[in-house]
A protein has these predicted regions:
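Long, low-complexity N-terminal extensions
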Residues: 1-124
Length: 124
C-alpha cells in the first residue's frame, strides 16, 4: 500500500507518514557517526572513517571540511548530498565576505544551507 504514496515527497500515506522521508532516513542511517564538541576556546570535530574496501584511498575520503577560517562542516550520510551542501555553503560565505568584508555569522550560514535542504526535500 505504501508504494502508492512513495512517488511524491510531500504526499502523506494513510498512516500519516512521508514515505520518501522514511526512505531517506533509512539510507542515511548506514552512515558513520560524527560528533562536534564546543569548548570555551574552540571546537573538536571527529568522525568514524572506516575503509569500506581496500580499493579506497582513505586519504582522499574527507568527512571534515573547512568552509571559512572559522566554520567547518562534517557529515554522516550521503557523500553526494554533503558535497552539494558544502559547495553551497562556501559560495554563500564568499558572497557574504565580498559584500561585508567579514566572515559570515555561523547562524546565517546554517539558515542558508537549511533552505537548500528544504528545497530539495520539497521538490525532489
Amino acid at each position: 500500500m505504501s508504494e502508492r504514496y512513495s512517488f511524491s515527497l510531500t504526499t502523506f500515506s494513510p498512516s500519516g507518514k512521508l514515505v520518501q522521508i522514511e526512505y531517506a532516513l533509512a539510507a542515511v542511517s548506514g552512515g558513520q557517526p560524527s560528533i562536534g564538541i564546543k569548548a570555551t576556546n574552540g571546537v573538536v570535530l571527529a568522525v568514524d572513517k572506516k575503509q569500506q574496501s581496500f580499493l579506497y584511498d582513505t586519504s582522499s575520503l574527507s568527512k571534515i571540511e573547512r568552509v571559512t577560517d572559522n566554520i567547518g562542516m562534517v557529515f554522516s550520510g550521503m557523500t553526494a548530498d554533503y558535497r552539494l551542501l558544502l559547495k553551497q555553503a562556501r559560495k554563500v560565505a564568499q558572497r557574504y565576505f565580498l559584500v561585508y568584508k567579514e566572515s559570515i555569522p555561523c547562524t546565517m550560514l546554517v539558515q542558508d544551507v537549511a533552505k537548500v535542504m528544504q528545497e530539495y526535500t520539497q521538490q525532489g
